[in-house]
Amino acid sequence: MSNVVFMVNIKNENVPTRVVPYEYSINSWRKWCDKNDCQLFVLDEYIFDSDYLRPNWYKLYVFDLLENSGIDYDQILVADCDTVVHPDCPNFFELSENKFCAVHNDGSYDWVCRSYENYSKHLFEGFEFSIWEYFNSGFLIMNKNHKQFYQNIIKFYFENRDLIVNLQDTFGVGTDQPVINFFVHKEDVELKLLPYRFNMQDMFRKEILHDDMLFTKIGWVYHFNAIPNNVDSQLTTYWMKKTYEYFHGGKND
């Protein structure tokens, strides 16, 4: 039995350039897993028609996918493919206390508040929780105790799919992230928030995403999201490639 890092990397034929940089993410996590005696699992195939269920929701099937693949696991990290991990990142599984772990979403608060307010009003009957406990879904640690919890979210999604899709299209809000947040707080799942350095989102806005690689000096997991003027994911590719090669040399293997 081992800890698992789970990622979803599915090529969208309509936006083929989007996945180009993700190999740098996967390879960085593969090296980290080898160093820390963990297993990497990358889902690269559709399990639903994309018009019915977008791939970012596939993360909810992590337990079923691992078990159907015959993988016996202890804890799981579900990580987004636009992250690169520092090779010396501490083993965060040892910090979990067997709780559901995440990192506060410290990025665009307009987007966070818009997601929070509209999901609360239109989907969760006015339920509220502290905005400072609203987390980013790009780095989530869980274990077998959370399997039924995820099954509940899946059931809820399909019962409310049309409303959820309409909320996303109408208000430009998050997809799986707000729903997971509301479920964690509504069902009183024991949550441990880890420091920002384990999911460094929105680095451009924090003025640390520069060629001096300052961001690599202050944290462990670099999340290359919310980069402005990012046409065809060119800047995502630039930064993920540069970061990977900064740690591992010029060969992406």
Segments the model singles out, each with a brief description of its role:
Residues E117-I131:
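Short, flexible, basic/aromatic active-site loop/helix in glycosyltransferases
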Residues W132-Q234:
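Catalytic core and acceptor-binding pocket of nucleotide-sugar-dependent glycosyltransferases
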Residues N56-K59, S115-S120, I208-F215:
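Short, surface-exposed amphipathic charged segments that create phosphate/polyanion-binding patches used
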Residues M1-S2, D72-D74, N98, K217-G219:
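A general structural motif
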Residues M1-D72, A226-P228, Y238-D253:
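N-terminal anchoring/stem segment of glycosyltransferases
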Residues Y46-D51, S108-D110, N199-F204, N229-N230:
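A short acidic, often aromatic-flanked loop/helix-cap motif at beta-alpha or helix-coil junctions
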Residues R30, F93, N181-H185:
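Non-transmembrane alpha-helical segments in soluble domains
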Residues P55-Y116, I141-M142, H146, Y150:
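GT-A fold catalytic core of metal-dependent nucleotide-sugar glycosyltransferases
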